[in-house]
Design a protein with these regions (language model features):
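Peripheral terminal and linker regions in Fe-S/redox and tRNA-modifying enzymes
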Residues: 66-69, 83, 87, 104-106
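Short, amphipathic alpha-helical interaction segments positioned at domain boundaries
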Residues: 106-129
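Short acidic, hydrophobic short linear motifs in intrinsically disordered regions
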Residues: 58, 64-77
Length: 129
């Protein structure tokens, strides 16, 4: 029964086996230890299709249900704000991150939510993907 959730790839498909993308999948799923996702799990595969290494590394700094500003994430990463903002917007457009404006502070905020419910559905339902 466990194999039923593993992906079966066509012969022509080349998995990137990107550890950072896999780490992001596990971050979104709050998975640690023996229960982590693998490269064959759908949670990894759907991210690999549209998330590059830079996006994944920035995505690891997203709070799960916790809003963070570009400035906060850039400071955590010791990276330029414009670079971090670009990656966060790409994550939001792909469906991994959520993006809104904190009207009290008049600043953009970003966050992630767990796979259940919805993150995979947001990615799949995006006309851009």
């Amino acid at each position: 029964m466990q194999d039923i959730t593993k992906m079966i790839f066509p012969d022509w498909y080349q998995c990137r086996y990107d550890q950072d993308v896999l780490a992001l999948a596990n971050h979104l799923g709050r998975k640690k230890g023996k229960e982590t996702f693998t490269f064959e799990d759908p949670e990894y595969v759907i991210l690999e299709a549209g998330v590059d290494k830079d996006m994944a590394i920035v995505g690891l700094h997203l709070g799960i249900y916790v809003e963070k500003t570009v400035e906060e994430i850039a400071k955590e990463m010791n990276q330029p704000e414009d670079y971090v903002e670009e990656q966060l917007k790409k994550l939001a457009f792909y469906g991994v991150a959520f993006w809104n404006t904190d009207k009290k502070r008049n600043v953009d905020v970003f966050w992630a939510e767990t796979w259940i419910p919805g993150t995979m559905e947001v990615i799949v339902n995006s006309q851009e993907n």
